[in-house]
Amino acid sequence: MVHSKKFRGVRQRQWGSWVSEIRHPLLKRRVWLGTFDTAETAARAYDQAAVLMNGQSAKTNFPVIKSNGSNSLEINSALRSPKSLSELLNAKLRKNCKDQTPYLTCLRLDNDSSHIGVWQKRAGSKTSPNWVKLVELGDKVNARPGGDIETNKMKVRNEDVQEDDQMAMQMIEELLNWTCPGSGSIAQV
């Protein structure tokens, strides 16, 4: 009953059916792709999902062929159309995700304009990164709670700031209050 050939993202149930799932790179959660009769069809479903999530750099079970007529990638499979699979994956991700728009927040230094601040990038290909809090380095210290137009729309109150954001803000304040060797001056917030 158990076949020796192993595919990425595919496993066999005790009663013989094959299941496929993939891990989302940002959410770090498994996305259930379905139950299949054969390991090959489950592997092809995984491949389609991997290409949708990661594009050309996806690690797949079968070779990915780049279409001549368009920039899309094709897998030798007739499981589902890429559009219907994309809609299915989006629906599953929305269901699994507590926060509808997951994001990455980090402390970032902008050397070009001498700024330091909290930088945020929301998940998705159509979103642009933005500054949540920006502080100019040097003699003049200027804190901008909104950052840019997008963040001005999302006024963040102190009681709504999550623990991670509070820690990032604390790190910025500690860095700004740190005395640089050789400078002799302390920046104040």
UniProtKB/Swiss-Prot annotation:
Major localization class: nucleus
Induction context: By wounding in cauline leaves, stems, and siliques, but not in rosette leaves.
Tissue expr: Found in all organs, mostly in veins, epidermis and trichome bases. Specific expression in lateral root tips.
Annotated SMART domains: AP2 (SM00380)
Gene Ontology BP term (one): ethylene-activated signaling pathway
Top-rank taxon: Eukaryota
Any single Gene Ontology cellular-component annotation: nucleus
InterPro entries linked to this entry: AP2/ERF_dom, AP2/ERF_dom_sf, AP2/ERF_ERF_subfamily, DNA-bd_dom_sf
Location(s) in or outside the cell: Nucleus
UniProt DNA-binding region: 6-63
Keywords annotated in UniProt: Activator, DNA-binding, Ethylene signaling pathway, Nucleus, Stress response, Transcription, Transcription regulation
GO MF entry, a single one: DNA binding
Cited function: Promotes cuticle formation by inducing the expression of enzymes involved in wax biosynthesis. Probably acts as a transcriptional activator. Binds to the GCC-box pathogenesis-related promoter element. May be involved in the regulation of gene expression by stress factors and by components of stress signal transduction pathways.
Family in the record: Belongs to the AP2/ERF transcription factor family. ERF subfamily.
Protein name per its UniProtKB record: Ethylene-responsive transcription factor SHINE 3
